[in-house]
C-alpha cells in the first residue's frame, strides 16, 4: 500500500486542532526542543507487519520509520530482535535480530545508525544442555556496539523468565552491562500462554540477578499494580510503556478510555519513581504522534524529558556512544 504522507499529516493536524489551547501551546513548546528515544519498537520485515503498520497509518518500511523519526524528533530507537533465520556458530541457539532495512549483516552493520537492537531469545529451543553454547552465540553479537540489550518473550514462548535455561544469558548480560527486556502482559496471539507473561515473574529473576537490569515491557498491561510493585521493590527493574494501544487511537479514544489511563496513572504515581519509566511505542503497532500525545497526558509534564529521553540513556547505556551528536 502506498501511504499518502500529506494526507497523513493532515489527519494529525486535525487531531491537534481538537486539543485545548493550553495543550496545543505545551505540545508546540516541547515539540520544538524535546528529544525522544523510542526504547521499544520493532524493525522486522514480515508480511503480517504490513497490515499492522497500515492500520496505524504507515508502511512497514525503513524509509517510513525514518520519516516518523524526523517528524517526531526521535533521535534513537531500540529495536527488539524478531528474525528467526540467524545461523548458529557454536552449536547453540542463535539470537533473533532485525532486518527491515536489509537482511542483517553481522560483519558490517547495515541497519540505520540511529537504531540499536536487543537480541531476541528463542526460549523454548534452549535447554540446560545447550544453554552455555547459546550464551556463546549471543556473546558474538554482544561484543558489537549496536547491540544494546537482550529481549525475552515469555507468553509467546512457554518459558518463565526466571527459568534456569536463561541464567547463562543473564550472566552474559551482567558481564557486558546489557539490560534484559521482558515481554509482560497481554499478547497479540491467542496461542500464547499468559501465565508466563505475568510481571510478578520478573521479580524472581531480578532478585536472583541483582546486578542485571530488567525491563518490564508494556508495564505488564493490564497488571499495572503488579508491574509497578516489582519495579518499586527491585532497584534493578525498570518499565517501558510500549504497546498499550494500537492503530490510530486519537483523542476520542483517550476520552472514552480515560478510566484506563487514570488507573495506569494511579499505579505510576504509587510507584513514584519516574526515573524508572521509559517511552516505547511497539511500532508498527501504533500511530506515533497520537501515542506520544496520549502518554504526555499519563506522565506529568515535569517528568517528560526523563521519560521520553533520559531514562533510556541510563537503562540502555550503550546508546550514549551511538547518538552521534543527535
PLM features: residue spans?
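Positively charged N-terminal leader segments that act as targeting/secretion signals
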Residues: 2-16, 20
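Mid-to-C-terminal alpha-helical segments outside catalytic/metal-binding sites
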Residues: 9-12, 27-76, 266, 270-278, ...
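Conserved, mostly hydrophobic/aromatic
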Residues: 40, 69, 150, 173, ...
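Active-site environment of divalent metal-dependent phosphoester hydrolases
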Residues: 44-47, 84-87, 124-126, 157, ...
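Acidic/histidine-rich helix-loop elements
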Residues: 44-60, 91-92, 187-189, 249-253
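Divalent metal-dependent hydrolysis catalytic cores, especially in the metallo-beta-lactamase
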Residues: 54-56, 63-92, 115-122, 148-149, ...
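Active-site gating/metal-coordination segments in enzymes
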Residues: 90-196
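Catalytic pocket-lining loop regions of alpha/beta-barrel enzymes
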Residues: 148-149, 162-278
